[in-house]
């Protein structure tokens, strides 16, 4: 359709003479293959659904602005943080994790919290969740997590048995499971939850000094959550309640905000840390590593087209900028390949050209001249006729050695190390988290756990009770009571290796 006169055309500009009536042989005859407009439309329709994300398929997004409110240049020379008051355009996408594109927003689930900052040194993607930890610490388990929380291959239904069988087979998962079964496992909406980078990352400054960091984003709207009963009533009326809440707030000028903080750990502190500081199943205690304010982001513009900006948004932890870097966190290392690879499958090799993914602070003519061709390459004239190799006699495409990162500390031989032999302290932190809850909040953890374990076999329930008891005896007793299981009939002293190996 021509935007100027509102007249309908086909995809290549030819006027459409009749939008409603197909071309036929006679008034009531069969269709003619020369009705090219119909063929063009139906063939496009047949192909317009792209693969959904393997996780985080149901999501909402908005554009906004990040503003620096505190000087952290002692830790990083990243330009996004170069001065107080500096603003950077950004995009955020929130999501559930387990459900498909049409799933309800209010499920007891982790929420995705993905941010894309359009800096002058390129895009910085911080791909996190609304929880500071995860179920495990080795990426080889990620595929099984996907299988366990999604649909059963025989019934094609989600299976609490599969879910809990997997979770309770990993004692280190209890920390994340405790958060998930707590009030924060059912946020009222995306505006009313905190966000976390979750992984350990690093920063480095002009002197080449590296520190390890964790990112925190604290909602300025306040934490609000639903009970299972409240959520069930809302889902019956509105499956898109979190998306609607975010969209309507922005449309009405009630712009949501989050304050950004970091925790900082020096390399020397990391060497002496009692646990593995790169273990995604654990937090750094704030009393030891206090929150340092960095800035605030505000979401103030809804996308004009959901598919263009939200469905096609592509986040990858490999998208970082000078002054920011990775860590030895094995889960982060595993994501460095997986995310970009998934986007290339889902959106194509040139998905960086999609407007929401384009670097805004770097001219497209300067972007990687050796990555050419591929389906739907159009944005930068495919780098024109310039050299597509290096070295060349034109003196272009030179490296930028001033952006070399400081040496990345590593040690040891390449080997499949058993991480359980490195650290089997699975229950200290979930126990502390449980004891921080009010008595009412503890009761809701028990109730939520019983609801979530409905239909799960007794042996799996017993395994979970045993883990909870090891975190705190009252935790185990409360879950057992909610599940109507006599805790006195359970062997609570089974060691962890046996628990993991035998699932008993």
From Swiss-Prot:
GO biological processes: hydrogen peroxide catabolic process; response to hydrogen peroxide
Cofactor: heme
Protein's UniProt name: Catalase
Coiled-coil region(s): none
UniProt: heme binding residues: 339
Active site: 56, 129
Keywords carried by this UniProt record: Heme, Hydrogen peroxide, Iron, Metal-binding, Oxidoreductase, Peroxidase
């Amino acid at each position: 359709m021509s935007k100027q006169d509102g007249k309908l055309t086909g995809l290549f500009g030819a006027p459409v003479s009749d939008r409603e009536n197909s071309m036929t042989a006679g008034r009531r005859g069969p269709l003619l293959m020369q009705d090219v407009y119909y063929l063009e439309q139906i063939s496009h329709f047949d192909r317009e659904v792209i693969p959904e994300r393997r996780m985080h398929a149901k999501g909402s997004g908005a554009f906004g602005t990040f503003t620096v409110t505190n000087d952290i240049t002692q830790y990083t020379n990243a330009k996004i943080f170069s001065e107080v008051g500096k603003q950077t355009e950004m995009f955020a996408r929130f999501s559930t994790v387990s459900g498909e594109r049409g799933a309800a927003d209010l499920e007891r689930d982790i929420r995705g919290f993905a941010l894309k900052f359009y800096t002058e040194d390129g895009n910085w993607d911080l791909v996190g969740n609304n929880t500071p930890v995860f179920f495990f610490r080795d990426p080889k388990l990620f595929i099984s997590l996907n299988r366990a929380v999604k649909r059963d291959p025989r019934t094609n239904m989600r299976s609490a048995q599969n879910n809990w069988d997997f979770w309770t087979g990993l004692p280190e998962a209890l920390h994340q499971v405790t958060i998930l079964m707590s009030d924060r496992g059912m946020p009222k909406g995306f505006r009313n939850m905190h966000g976390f980078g979750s992984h350990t990352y690093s920063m480095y400054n002009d002197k080449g000094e590296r520190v390890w960091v964790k990112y925190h984003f604290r909602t300025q709207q306040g934490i609000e959550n639903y009970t299972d009963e409240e959520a069930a009533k809302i889902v019956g009326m509105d499956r898109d309640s979190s998306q609607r809440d975010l969209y309507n707030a922005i449309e009405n000028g009630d712009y949501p905000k989050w304050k950004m903080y970091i925790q900082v750990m020096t390399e020397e502190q990391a060497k002496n840390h009692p646990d593995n500081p790169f273990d995604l199943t654990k937090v750094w205690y704030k009393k030891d590593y206090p929150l340092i304010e960095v800035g605030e982001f505000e979401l103030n513009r809804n996308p004009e087209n959901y598919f263009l900006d939200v469905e096609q948004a592509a986040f990858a932890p490999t998208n970082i900028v000078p002054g920011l870097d990775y860590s030895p966190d094995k889960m982060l290392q595993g994501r460095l390949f997986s995310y970009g690879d998934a986007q290339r499958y889902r959106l194509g090799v040139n998905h960086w050209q999609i407007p929401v993914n384009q670097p805004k602070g770097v001219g497209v003519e300067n972007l990687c001249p050796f990555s050419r061709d591929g389906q739907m390459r159009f944005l930068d004239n495919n780098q024109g006729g310039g050299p597509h190799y290096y070295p060349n006699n034109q003196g272009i495409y030179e490296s930028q050695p001033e952006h070399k990162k400081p040496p990345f500390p590593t040690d040891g031989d390449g080997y499949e190390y058993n991480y359980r032999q490195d650290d089997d302290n699975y229950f200290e932190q979930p126990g502390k988290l449980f004891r921080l809850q009010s008595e009412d909040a503890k009761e809701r953890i028990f109730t939520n756990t019983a609801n979530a374990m409905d239909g799960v076999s007794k042996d799996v329930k017993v395994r979970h009770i045993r883990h909870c008891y090891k975190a705190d005896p009252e935790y185990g007793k409360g879950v057992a009571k909610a599940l109507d299981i006599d805790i006195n009939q359970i062997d609570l002293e089974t060691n962890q290796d046996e628990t993991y190996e035998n699932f008993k």
